A protein has these predicted regions:
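Generic structural signal for well-ordered beta-strand positions
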Residues: 123-124
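Disulfide-stabilized, aromatic/cysteine-rich ligand-recognition loop
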Residues: 1, 8, 14, 18, ...
């Protein structure tokens, strides 16, 4: 489905796609929680494909998965599968065996900050952001705020580099900046891809379990008409939440399409 179609159908349901502010907050909060930026080693990278079964972490609620290093300490016989020699495939949950001893359970999906596959599997086409790339705006992210105002944030113009810095600022924007090139294990441990052709939408999350694709990864190389089996998005809601008067009233709610 194209960005344009996903945007239309989500709006028809009173929803939107996950947006730039939401993704930035997820990244920043995950860094704050774990005190590191390499979320693929912290929470695992997941199975190395873009066709994972949704709901693989549902039985564990919002508990985050763990990565290879932490799982290995508990069980040194876990699957050791490196992707491109850089990142460990799969993720694990801490558990107990029948004798009460600590063990781990391997899963295909990752869960980071309570979000299943917030990176890997499929790209998230983001709402409320694009790169106009017109005169004077090369590489600038145009971000629509919840109140309708627009901010222009200058990002880096070099494509295919490992991220070494982000704009941050008042809104803690995860917009890649600078001209240095990092690596899969330094700085933000993820990559940025950009086209300076006019009007590019922005994807986050990456696909597969590539080392380049954690919570700070961004791809601003496609227009709104692009479609692919490994590109999708997430429904999100911004607005006023009203408490139902009763359980019966809540159950009586019907989707407005």
């Amino acid at each position: 489905m194209t960005w344009t179609d996903f945007h239309y159908y989500s709006q028809q349901r009173g929803m939107q796609q996950i947006d730039a502010l939401m993704h930035s907050r997820i990244a920043n909060l995950s860094y704050a929680k774990y005190g590191r930026r390499d979320m693929q080693e912290q929470c695992g990278a997941g199975q190395h494909n873009n066709n994972r079964t949704t709901g693989g972490t549902a039985d564990h609620g919002m508990t985050d998965t763990i990565g290879y290093d932490e799982a290995y300490v508990i069980n040194n016989k876990i699957t050791n599968s490196l992707i491109d020699g850089l990142v460990h495939q799969y993720a694990w949950y801490k558990s107990r065996d029948e004798y009460g001893q600590a063990t781990v359970v391997q899963v295909n999906n990752i869960c980071c900050l309570g979000y299943e596959d917030i990176y890997g599997n499929k790209y998230d086409m983001m709402d409320g952001v694009d790169l106009p790339n017109d005169s004077g705006n090369q590489g600038k992210w145009r971000i629509w705020m919840p109140d309708g105002s627009i901010r222009m944030v200058q990002g880096k113009k070099d494509s295919g580099q490992w991220i070494t810095g982000v704009a941050h600022g008042k809104y803690m924007d995860m917009v890649p900046v600078g001209n240095l090139n990092g690596s899969s294990s330094t700085y933000y441990t993820d990559m940025y891809w950009i086209s300076t052709a006019t009007v590019r939408v922005v994807y986050r999350g990456c696909n597969y379990a590539n080392a380049s694709g954690g919570v700070s990864y961004a791809n601003a190389g496609n227009d709104a008409s692009n479609t692919s089996a490994y590109v999708g998005s997430r429904l999100a809601f911004r607005g006023k939440i009203v408490r139902a008067q009763s359980v019966a009233a809540y159950k009586a709610i019907r989707e407005v399409a």
